[in-house]
Amino acid sequence: YRAAWFGIFQNVLVIAWVMRAMAKIIIVVMGWEDGTTVIGIDAGVFTVLVLFLIAVTYTALSGLWGVVVTDVLQFGLAMGGSIYLAVATWSRLGGLDGILARFPGHDFNAVEVLRMLPAPEKLLAANPFTEFLLLILVVWWASYQVDGGGYISQRLFAAKNERHSVFAYLWFCVAHICLRPWPWIIVGLGGMALFGQVGDPETYYPMMMKEILPPGIFGLVLASFFAAFMSTIDTQLNWGSSLVVNDLLRRFIWKGKSDRSYILAARLSVMGLAVLGALASFALSDISFAWKLILSITAGIGSVYIARWYWWRVNAWSEISAMVTAGICTLVFAIMASTGRFAESPVTRFPYSTVITFLIVVPVWITVTLLTRPVSDERLKDFYRRVRPGGKGWERIRKAAGVEALPGTALRTASKIAAGIVLVFSTLIGTGSLILGEPGRGL
């Protein structure tokens, strides 16, 4: 069930929004109007499909090693391009003061736009401050990405040793969450200052590329976007095909076949996921809708992923019940939002609906866990001997396995988690505060 859910449904949704984003960029860059076609196909979609086929080809041929190697090169190219555009935007508009000077003519509050943290307002009411609190206190860890996700696990397992994997993940958190977004944000602010509310805000970035960059540099930055696009696509396809083949076909449908057969199945699954993602991209007009949907349909699953390290009773039904319940809640909120009575209610809007879903999902999966059969003691004991999870929740299994308790394991793990959260949030907010003219908070 998990393989089908994440490997196919969710994976296809992510691929679709990446394709749609790239299509929007290409349409702006090429100056195409809506309706422009190439060999009878929408011009933006046609170009993305060509790039997509290239990414699919080397993903299918190279496997995880090829994906990781190309990701390193593509990440460097993508970051270099985004940093250059951010610096050029900052210089062209005269820094923060220049951006502020251009805001008064627009229909939004420049102070609120440039505020690193929203101004405190009344709690338990629909406002930006409440939404901010919900995002940082609940949404980010309650969803499926709390453990990093499958493609992060792939890379951690492929590391030389545990020490390498720990430092790799720390670097990923800092680079991916704290540093990578800020060049994009600077360019986005520049786009808001220059273009205001003209056109689709999701196209401001390529509009800034055309406005700011000279021809040669423009080509390099555009190439960096292609690199980021293909890096994301090959990562998603490699992870998705590994779930489909190893967790679905090999275990339940196509058992006992040769390695060669499974390699062929992996390549075919890459092609299948690519086709599904391309088809799904045609249905997307708003990119943010896709990631909000994913956070909503996985709300509460993060609590299962955390609990399984501290409570031996968590089983497969815990995760399945959380997924099903979150999906049902998301569907119910979507139906409510489409009716006149609830159309304007914040209850049906992200992130309020996501948090409500989480509050429903948690008691459901705990109840299902207690009502279903636990994992066999032999498997739990084997897991405990290998991993040595801490806390009182594993005490029964520890005694059954005849293993000495590691003193302070749970406390040490909790302190490391807390330190990691503080590091990431402090670096993220501190960097932004320095950029946005709040040095006191930044330092």
Model feature map: region roles:
Residues Y1-L443:
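Membrane-embedded helix-loop-helix hairpins and adjacent transmembrane boundary segments
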